[in-house]
């Protein structure tokens, strides 16, 4: 077949090199090999996140604003906050009346467990009428959980939060001073929801005696009490669905080992280059159930690359193709 550029790659983990003998030798970027692999590590198709998120908040004072702070309209409220935080003696009435301080809300979101001594970044927002908190000094502020327990202490220099495009400020020095109830639950979240795949992962975890529960087509909740177990889970090998990659432009077909084609009958008009014969010769092809790479090898001498691709696409449309069909152009000039 003159212009046929046919590549059959069967991926069965350790047999990759051997099965590549069925290829025409076209150089293809290794990333395509990886994309067709039927065995991947869990961390390649999913992320692991703690199930718990701790929200800590507190009301504090930013000082050193040099006339950019709150007006004296809320003087009584500011004094009350200073007294609650035991810093009333650090702030003189002159600072309140000269707009050098501002009443602020400090908030912190901690994903996972709050660990004593750990350092975090918090958001700071003006509560009253201060317009600019840049380079102010957040005085010691208690951050509490929803139960009212003091979990962290915040203080430091306020800086604009560029991620919020000019609105809001941050501080970098929030120290957790109390451990909360330690939670060992995590969610494995697939990058693309798939009930078959999520159930496959569930069975593997169960076989390894790892407590887990399917929550949706993309999420499994697990229990992991140490980092080493999380590392083991990240590196679990998962068998994914077979894949078939087709490059129509270059006439390339890549099929993973377990991709299969079912039984059906296909009618196609073959282009006949003999001028003495009919230019359009309709041919009926009986396709029997077999592995896709076997089907292509069996018919590569009788069918063109275009015809093979037509048959594969037709099989997909009538649910006779076991595998995910990917249409993509491959650069065969890569080394």
UniProtKB/Swiss-Prot annotation:
Instruction: Give the InterPro entries listed for this entry.
Output: Flag_FlgI (IPR001782)
Predominant localisation class: periplasm
Signal sequence interval, chain numbering: 1-17
**A GO molecular-function annotation:** structural molecule activity
**Primary role:** Assembles around the rod to form the L-ring and probably protects the motor/basal body from shearing forces during rotation.
Q: Which family does it belong to?
A: Belongs to the FlgI family.
Q: What is this protein called?
A: Flagellar P-ring protein
Q: Which organism is it from?
A: Borreliella burgdorferi (strain ATCC 35210 / DSM 4680 / CIP 102532 / B31)
Task: Provide the taxonomic classification.
Answer: Bacteria, Pseudomonadati, Spirochaetota, Spirochaetia, Spirochaetales
């Amino acid at each position: 077949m003159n212009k046929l550029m046919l590549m059959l790659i069967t991926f069965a983990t350790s047999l990759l090199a051997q099965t590549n003998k069925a290829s025409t030798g076209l150089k293809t970027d290794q990333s395509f090999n990886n994309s067709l692999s039927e065995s991947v590590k869990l961390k390649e198709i999913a992320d692991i996140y703690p199930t718990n998120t701790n929200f800590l908040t507190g009301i504090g004072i930013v000082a050193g604003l040099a006339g950019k702070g709150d007006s004296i309209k809320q003087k009584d409220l500011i004094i009350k906050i200073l007294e609650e935080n035991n810093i009333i003696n650090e702030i003189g009435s002159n600072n309140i009346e000269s707009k050098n301080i501002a009443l602020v809300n400090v908030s912190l979101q901690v994903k996972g467990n709050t660990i004593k001594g750990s350092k975090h970044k918090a958001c700071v927002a003006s509560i009253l009428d201060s317009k600019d908190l840049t380079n102010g000094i957040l005085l010691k502020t208690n951050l509490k959980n929803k139960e009212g327990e003091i979990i962290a202490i915040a203080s430091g220099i306020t800086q604009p939060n560029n991620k919020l495009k000019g609105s809001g400020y941050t501080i970098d020095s929030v120290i957790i001073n109390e451990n909360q109830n330690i939670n060992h639950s995590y969610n494995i979240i697939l990058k693309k929801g798939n009930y078959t795949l999520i159930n496959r992962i569930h069975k593997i975890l169960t076989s390894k005696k790892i407590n887990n529960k399917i929550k949706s087509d993309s999420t499994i909740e697990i229990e992991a009490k140490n980092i080493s177990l999380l590392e083991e889970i990240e590196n679990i090998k998962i068998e994914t669905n077979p894949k078939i990659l087709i490059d129509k432009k270059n006439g390339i077909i890549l099929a993973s080992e377990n991709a299969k084609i079912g039984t059906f009958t296909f009618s196609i008009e073959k282009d006949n280059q003999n001028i003495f014969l009919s230019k359009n010769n309709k041919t009926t092809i009986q396709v029997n159930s077999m592995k896709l790479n076997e089907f292509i090898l069996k018919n590569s001498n009788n069918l063109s690359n275009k015809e093979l691709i037509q048959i594969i696409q037709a099989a997909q449309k009538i649910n006779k193709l076991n595998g995910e069909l990917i249409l993509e152009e491959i650069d065969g000039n890569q080394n």
